[in-house]
Amino acid sequence: MEPRAAAAGEPEPPAASSSFQARLWKNLQLGVGRSKGGGGGRAGGPERRTADTPSPSPPPPVGTGNAPARGSGAGSRWSGFKKRKQVLDRVFSSSQPNLCCSSPEPLEPGGAGRAEQGSTLRRRIREHLLPAVKGPAAASGAAGGTPPGGRSPDSAPSSSSASSSLSSSPQPPPRGDRARDEGARRQGPGAHLCHQKSSSLPGTACLEQLLEPPPPPAEPARSPAESRAPETGEEHGSSQKIINTAGTSNAEVPLADPGMYQLDITLRRGQSLAARDRGGTSDPYVKFKIGGKEVFRSKIIHKNLNPVWEEKACILVDHLREPLYIKVFDYDFGLQDDFMGSAFLDLTQLELNRPTDVTLTLKDPHYPDHDLGIILLSVILTPKEGESRDVTMLMRKSWKRSSKELSENEVVGSYFSVKSLFWRTCGRPALPVLGFCRAELQNPYCKNVQFQTQSLRLSDLHRKSHLWRGIVSITLIEGRDLKAMDSNGLSDPYVKFRLGHQKYKSKIMPKTLNPQWREQFDFHLYEERGGVIDITAWDKDAGKRDDFIGRCQVDLSALSREQTHKLELQLEEGEGHLVLLVTLTASATVSISDLSVNSLEDQKEREEILKRYSPLRIFHNLKDVGFLQVKVIRAEGLMAADVTGKSDPFCVVELNNDRLLTHTVYKNLNPEWNKVFTFNIKDIHSVLEVTVYDEDRDRSADFLGKVAIPLLSIQNGEQKAYVLKNKQLTGPTKGVIYLEIDVIFNAVKASLRTLIPKEQKYIEEENRLSKQLLLRNFIRMKRCVMVLVNAAYYVNSCFDWDSPPRSLAAFVLFLFVVWNFELYMIPLVLLLLLTWNYFLIISGKDNRQRDTVVEDMLEDEEEEDDKDDKDSEKKGFINKIYAIQEVCVSVQNILDEVASFGERIKNTFNWTVPFLSWLAIVALCVFTAILYCIPLRYIVLVWGINKFTKKLRSPYAIDNNELLDFLSRVPSDVQVVQYQELKPDPSHSPYKRKKNNLG
């Protein structure tokens, strides 16, 4: 048991809290050194510490032996609590905007006895946290302390404009605790700080401790001369002074949370500027810079050392970390302008939504002693996102610092600061905040090492991605009619996205008002309600600050989950639109659907789906072609992407522009997802793409494998093992994924949908110049052309009678065809060719050969891609020869299109896709009958009338060619190779796995 203090006469505190008391005592002493010249109230109380007063020695360690039982010993032992009592009151009350700093109580002879009342740490903490409204506090108020209202007698009344004198040196202002310490030294004991800035205990300053970096090492104690230096008074602008207002203030301190702020600056005038011309005058003008980029330039006032500008500038800033840099120059015609001085304005010291008059002293870093005059400004800082902040994100930010860098009281202080900020944001009274603080101190985790362990675990949990409530996938498609920001009537636009602390930036599209981005970004949702995504469009300017084009927002709570939404957003404060695709996908905590809950397993739902796509409902919603259900079961033998030999795999399922994700299975090479995805089929010729990625918190996800499955090749209800392929789908990679897919569709709707343009996929891999790809496309085109060349050689050989029997047969056939030719014979010949190849296939005489040439070319291309990736990492500056590259890429793509066209015609007659070949047979039969029954002149007449009147009947109809649309559904030889299924390893067979389990 711990010895009792004689003067206190209280029950003994528990032994478990003794170590915490000792640490709290030590931290209170450290807080004294950090809070010199702090808070309001009267200075020089009987026990008040100044820079001249040394800190008392720490109390002796608590043990099991006897301790001195004198009243003086007890009083000195717990004097730290009494001296910091109202400091604690000020700290916790500072979270309420209508509370003021209370003055310290005078110590009375009986004060030690009152401080020692209570038997536990909880009792003592309650006494220090609850504001005293009677007794000593009232007495101190009556004796000349802080009067009602919270202001000391010498404090000036606060004004609405908060006029302040801010003089700056060219060096950036200090940040964090060091800035507060320096401000305390300059202001001295008589200065009065705003209550939001009180920082008596390390780690308990409500907002700075939450949002600022860790404090630097403690500076050496200052001499009495140094501590008295600020009291002698300062010349105007001789040193940097932090903005402070006396008394109570309802203005909010700007948060360091990343966000959009509007800075309205009125450049009023200059006084006593430096003369730079021979006549003893100057032609001054002012530049504003943020982040090294110019954001404003004033007009030139000729021959004046006291210029009056009265110019206004509106600046949008992303964050408040960068100060505003003000530079003054003297304009010289034909020569370099002369420098007249500069100053910094720290944006973090400005109060929100409150006009502030600022006086800046100009300095030259090369000649710091020269008097260069002053600049007068009026500044208003306004948050663009409003006053409400995401409390969840602020709490997450408070745990970013490692527990190795935080002492115990800093963890407690930051935790208190977050909760204080929460109650302040909600506008609740002070009592619930104090109640929370008491409850937290009673928590057993506040004891010894257990608290640090718990804080470390909580920090890790907040950083873990399995706390996501979902994933927001945003596809930035294009911009339309954006505002021209450059002198040439164009812009170089890019877009920024922000959701909480997550930010993304798109690529820059040079010199266009209708950019095509086609980029995709993923955000993590930490709230059930979703949140709001802030979107801003900017114009890139070299050497200057980027111009603001416009902004818009997406409220995720208004969007339904598991669906892809196409949004056309009007830019506010600007011109133009942004076109986005937004998909909300649930995470593991709110699953898409488990294997036990899916549509096709329920017999009633299955019958309803079959009825919806029955042949009787042909003309009901022609765009709804079918229903697709994908069961993502598991994967085995995935590639290890982390240094630990494991991966954090998740699966992405894509059908055209619909994109859904599974949850992440951590530290596993054989993950089991057991999720069911459902899609509405708009085109039966679409390809289902299933990609496995490794999640990486610090950078983009790593590719593990991919498989592409045409919907028409799917066998319903069969669990199948698909070997994962590389990014180009040209060769296998490590791992197998098990899928079970069901497709239900209406054949008539699918056939009609085949004859209209296919849906464009917005996210496609950007083409790049590749020597091997260019060679491959040239060879493909050459093979198609050689078919026609060989046919011409064959006909010419018949004319030359190289083989008399063959030439004679060709001559007789020519006479017969020309004599009896009718137009319907053209589709009839094609029909006979299709029928002939079909009978060859079903009879087992398949003349289709595996295209090994194309496969070899794809393998060579894959090797070259790997080399290009390595070269691109070494040569990040490859921006040369862009014009030649664009031309070569265009030629490369044209060769690809021509070669693909010829290959699609060949594959149509080869029955590569039986559905399309049967559709071609039906179409050719109909076309043959029409040509047989109707004269050609009437067919041509109907065709011409249709073409001439199409725009009159449907002004916005898309001009298309049905034959080309049909051929676009037929895969080329490259796609045939990509869609081929690889034979899995027999060890991965699900049936063998079950047999082994049974055995």
Swiss-Prot record:
* Annotated ranges, domain C2: 242-360, 452-569, 603-724
The answer on whether this UniProt entry bears the keyword Transmembrane reads yes
Q: Is the keyword Ribosomal protein assigned to this protein?
A: no
Q: What is its main location?
A: membrane
Q: Where does Ca(2+) 1 bind?
A: D277, D283, D330, D332
Cofactor(s) in the UniProt record: Ca(2+)
A GO biological process of this protein is: regulation of neuronal synaptic plasticity
- Transmembrane portions of the chain: 811-831, 914-934
The annotated topology with respect to the bilayer is: Multi-pass membrane protein
CDD domains, A to Z:
C2A_MCTP_PRT, C2B_MCTP_PRT, C2C_MCTP_PRT
Q: Where does Ca(2+) 2 bind?
A: D277, D330, D332, D338
Q: Where is the composition biased (Basic and acidic residues)?
A: 175-185, 228-238
Question: Which GO terms fall under molecular function for this chain's record?
Answer: calcium ion binding
Please provide the record's keywords in A-Z order.
Calcium, Cytoplasmic vesicle, Endoplasmic reticulum, Endosome, Membrane, Metal-binding, Repeat, Synapse, Transmembrane, Transmembrane helix
Per the annotation, how and in what number is the cofactor bound? Binds Ca(2+) via the C2 domains in absence of phospholipids.
The UniProt record gives the binding positions of Ca(2+) 6 as D642, D694, D696, D702
Start and end residues of each stretch annotated as Disordered? 1-241
Q: Which family does it belong to?
A: Belongs to the MCTP family.
Protein name, per record: Multiple C2 and transmembrane domain-containing protein 1
Q: What is the lineage of its organism?
A: Eukaryota, Metazoa, Chordata, Craniata, Vertebrata
| The encoding gene | MCTP1
